[in-house]
Amino acid sequence: MTYSKDLSIVISLYNEDESLPELVSWIEKVMTAEGYRYEIIMVDDGSRDKSWEIIKELSERNPYIRGISFRRNYGKSAALYHGFKAAEGRVVITMDADLQDSPDEIPELY
């Protein structure tokens, strides 16, 4: 099987509009430094804040970012499931959007 990307980073989120720009910037910095072919799949699990609008803005600026939006909150398992289904990377890594997981650790996971 041939993969178009080295890594798929699946991020499930709910009401994380404030952390998304910083998280994406941090991931991009690490991916560029490591030279990975990657994608970021953000699954908005029915957020009531501006998370989906921010995901759309980020994906317009970076073709490596894709978003999936749920109409209501289905839970983290459902969000991850749909993120995994959409993933095109050889390796899939999950992260939370609240900056509790450091993108600096991604190379160790890969």
Short names for language-model regions:
Residues 1-110:
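Structured catalytic core of nucleotide-sugar glycosyltransferases
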